[in-house]
UniProtKB/Swiss-Prot annotation:
Top-rank EC class of the record's enzyme: ligase
Record's protein name: Lysine--tRNA ligase
Compartment(s): Cytoplasm
Domain of life: Bacteria
Cofactor binding summary note: Binds 3 Mg(2+) ions per subunit.
Gene that specifies this protein: lysS
Family: Belongs to the class-II aminoacyl-tRNA synthetase family.
Binding sites annotated in the UniProt record for Mg(2+) 1: 406, 413
Pfam short name (any one): tRNA_anti-codon
EC number assigned by the record: 6.1.1.6
Stored HAMAP family: Lys_tRNA_synth_class2
Keywords noted in UniProt: Aminoacyl-tRNA synthetase, ATP-binding, Cytoplasm, Ligase, Magnesium, Metal-binding, Nucleotide-binding, Protein biosynthesis
Lineage, broadest ranks: Bacteria, Bacillati, Bacillota, Bacilli, Bacillales
Amino acid sequence: MSEEMNDQMLVRRQKLQELYDLGIDPFGSKFDRSGLSSDLKEEWDQYSKEELVEKEADSHVAIAGRLMTKRGKGKAGFAHVQDLAGQIQIYVRKDQVGDDEFDLWKNADLGDIVGVEGVMFKTNTGELSVKAKKFTLLTKSLRPLPDKFHGLQDIEQRYRQRYLDLITNEDSTRTFINRSKIIQEMRNYLNNKGFLEVETPMMHQIAGGAAARPFVTHHNALDATLYMRIAIELHLKRLIVGGLEKVYEIGRVFRNEGVSTRHNPEFTMIELYEAYADYHDIMDLTESMVRHIANEVLGSAKVQYNGETIDLESAWTRLHIVDAVKEATGVDFYEVKSDEEAKALAKEHGIEIKDTMKYGHILNEFFEQKVEETLIQPTFIYGHPTEISPLAKKNPEDPRFTDRFELFIVGREHANAFTELNDPIDQKGRFEAQLAEKAQGNDEAHEMDEDYIEALEYGMPPTGGLGIGIDRLVMLLTDSPSIRDVLLFPYMRQK
């Protein structure tokens, strides 16, 4: 911290003491506002300067917020007060507010939170303003804000001190308001479709429902190892068994993996399950829901991302994973008959694989390394190999593949879904195959979950399921390049 900053803080501490000496509480209590800055503008900006003079008796307002600018000398001054909706100018005159309140005004610093009661008027330049009749200090700020002309430029500081970012960067505030709206519209859409929102445990006895490394914790009283959930899936499907036919949960998921522009150790997902549906129905639902959210929150289903127009309005492409790989590389995995042939093709095309990988894993590596980043417009990739889809139903026409899809937009995965595997015998066999992979060194392979198998043995109806990473969806709809831009408090390495 610079010497100048220390000096500014010292001055503010002295002002704080002066307030106490005068019997003024520098951390005040409730203040009744008549509205936000946007409300005042909507109601009063339509009038001319002269009309506002005529309406002065009816234009009494009360506004509160943070002082962001301040200017003027002598017996009057202007400032801008910022609230959630934006900024509005205030005008403070000694002969209007009195000596004591004008002294408060003179000693106020940028960053202080104030309340102003007054009447509406327009300046000679036509700016709608509040002429103060009463000026109240609500909270004394003891630290100066970042430079008003440059805002908070250090990207890491923006993430570590999000509160400063929200104060100084209007775009950040808009992003997080839109994040809330996106989640709300998701709920509205599903509730209107008859889905029931539920809550399931975040600490699991078995880490299941996804291929990921879990965070491990310990329950002292029970002397039990527990895992922070890596997916919501298996508990929701137990509810389908129990007769709750359309369920969803929006919640935090935890994966003990790397941090990047696309990944945070804890993130928000929605998972939903619908009895008597299949992955085609879930494709339709996903496309309709995302389009609805974009229209409701942004006013358009054509959105800008990284300089590219993403068309969520037109019908989304649907492409089998084998066809996608064939289009990109010329390799037709329908014709590949063995793991050895797949490995030879990987070597020929420069695909990095592990020695333990089989046909399905290698096909998926072809896709991830040669196709994924090219899928800019919304594209459903379906038909994933059985080896990498332990919870999805096999395709009845070709059991090498499953009735599963992933949604790709701007070159990254946004959703994962499938017709759920409801055959308990097949499911147990898949879990056993996953255990074999774990024994060969795949630490992301699925554990055996006997309790889930038991639930399936009571009978789960044909079901379609979906998982969407909400953070990535918010990135898309707010044109944010990093997941940290859409998390209020992203994980940061310790200083």
